[in-house]
């Protein structure tokens, strides 16, 4: 939930944030390590917490996860290499990294085979391609149970409109491939994501139990996948992690009784661990009136923070004055916040479908700063070079100390691959 920048229970305070642009430039991503540790602790009942690093793949964040005993999920060769760079070691800890995908390219296939990284397969073809190269490989099956859930159609990870997972009626074909190549089945993974919809979560847990029983194979583990929500707006409900665990643990116990031995329970959070830990600081560069609309234009665009333009996602916005004047209780103006891109959709205050909306914000002027809250997940990791704009620096606070964990990309680096 968006926190006040004048609260001292995190390092993401107005005082701390205002000193960063002078040192690191603007815009800049900022994270608080203590918030990440707090979120990890909330899931301590699960046997394995496996971070979906696509949410925030900076290797310094991954090192923090590893130090807290969190394992990692990788969805590309690049993410495998990031995990290795962060100190995860599949040679000494075979379950440190799991590779999850619906397809596997040749380079990734060779790397997971070389390192014997367990593969969470979302297609029968992928299983067969792996088995031909690496017989006996350890595998998970990502199952699509025929229904889904998500905050946007673009984030729905189940049902017939989703590309993800092996369709539940194709599990016999998957088993044929497993047996043909003597693959070792570790477990079944079901990533649907229910947030605070506990009735839907019960449906997911029930589907997991049914799939395991009907599949008729022994398993070491089940994975609840990800999809734990965080409250992006004031008044939104936070997920009850005790209740969430309780429903999944009941499913795990049913499966363990059926199989006749203990079964590990994994969870694969992404946004839950990092979303609330991050903010994006951006500077106001222009204020103008467009008919009845009051626009504030900032130096960050959707190339930096994609979620509002892509999903219509809400991020709370706070204003900080550059000259020290107080804006905390200042009168507000209905404001459209937009970026610098040569693109009409470069608006941070929009709904899904692109409808522009306003926010009640204090009146600001060029040189002031806006802070976009809860950007720790799918912020920096979804950034692009659109409009030939360099990637932003990332800064991590830990116990009051700020350190650079990614420097700003230069224009020279942006051009380097084309200077042949």
UniProtKB/Swiss-Prot annotation:
InterPro entries, A to Z: Ala_racemase/Decarboxylase_C, DAP_deCOOHase_LysA, De-COase2_C, De-COase2_CS, De-COase2_N, De-COase2_pyr-phos_BS, Orn/DAP/Arg_de-COase, PLP-binding_barrel
EC number: 4.1.1.20
Broad class of enzyme this protein falls into: lyase
Residue positions of the active site: 342 (proton donor)
Pfam families hit by this protein: Orn_Arg_deC_N (PF02784), Orn_DAP_Arg_deC (PF00278)
Keyword Nucleotide-binding: no
Gene3D superfamilies: Alanine racemase (3.20.20.10), Lyase, Ornithine Decarboxylase, Chain A, domain 1 (2.40.37.10)
Any one of the GO BP annotations: lysine biosynthetic process via diaminopimelate
Activity profile over pH: Optimum pH is 6.7-6.8.
GO molecular-function terms, A-Z: diaminopimelate decarboxylase activity; protein homodimerization activity; pyridoxal phosphate binding
Family designation: Belongs to the Orn/Lys/Arg decarboxylase class-II family. LysA subfamily.
Protein name, as recorded: Diaminopimelate decarboxylase
Organism of derivation: Escherichia coli (strain K12)
Gene transcribed to yield this protein: lysA
């Amino acid at each position: 939930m968006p926190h006040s920048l004048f609260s001292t229970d995190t390092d993401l305070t107005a005082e701390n944030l205002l000193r960063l642009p002078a040192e690191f430039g603007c815009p800049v991503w900022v994270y608080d390590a203590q918030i990440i540790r707090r979120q990890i602790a909330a899931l301590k009942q699960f046997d394995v917490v496996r971070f979906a690093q696509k949410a925030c793949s900076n290797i310094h964040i991954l090192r923090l996860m590893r130090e807290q005993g969190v394992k990692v999920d990788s969805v590309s060769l690049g993410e495998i290499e990031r995990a290795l760079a962060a100190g995860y070691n599949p040679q000494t800890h075979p379950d440190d990294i799991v590779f999850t995908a619906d397809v596997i390219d040749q380079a990734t296939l060779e790397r997971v085979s070389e390192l014997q990284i367990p593969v969470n397969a979302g297609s029968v073809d992928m299983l067969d391609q792996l088995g031909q190269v690496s017989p006996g490989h350890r595998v998970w099956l990502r199952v699509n149970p025929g229904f889904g859930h998500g905050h946007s159609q673009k984030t729905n990870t189940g049902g017939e409109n989703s590309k993800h997972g092996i369709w539940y009626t194709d599990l016999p074909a998957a088993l044929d491939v497993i047996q043909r190549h003597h693959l070792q089945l570790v477990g079944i993974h079901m990533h649907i994501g229910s947030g605070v919809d506990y009735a839907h979560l019960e449906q997911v847990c029930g589907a997991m139990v049914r799939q395991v029983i009907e599949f008729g194979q022994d398993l070491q583990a089940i994975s609840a996948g990800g999809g734990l929500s965080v409250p992006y707006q004031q008044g939104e409900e936070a997920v009850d992690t005790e209740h969430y665990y309780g429903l999944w643990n009941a499913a795990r116990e049913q499966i363990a009784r059926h199989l006749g031995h203990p079964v590990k329970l994994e969870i694969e959070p992404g946004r839950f661990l990092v979303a609330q830990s991050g903010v994006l600081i951006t500077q106001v560069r222009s204020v103008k009136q467009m008919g009845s609309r009051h626009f504030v234009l900032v130096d960050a665009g959707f190339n930096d923070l994609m979620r509002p333009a892509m999903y219509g996602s809400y991020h709370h916005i706070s204003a900080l004055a550059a000259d020290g004047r107080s804006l905390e209780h200042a009168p507000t103006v209905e404001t459209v916040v937009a970026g610098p891109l040569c693109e009409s959709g470069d608006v941070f205050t929009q709904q899904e479908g692109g409808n522009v909306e306003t926010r009640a914000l204090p009146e600001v002027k060029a040189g002031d700063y806006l802070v976009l809250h809860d950007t720790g997940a799918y912020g920096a990791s979804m950034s692009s070079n659109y409009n030939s704009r360099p990637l932003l620096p990332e800064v991590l606070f830990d116990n009051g100390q700020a350190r650079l964990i990614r420097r700003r990309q230069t224009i020279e680096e942006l051009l380097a691959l084309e200077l042949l």
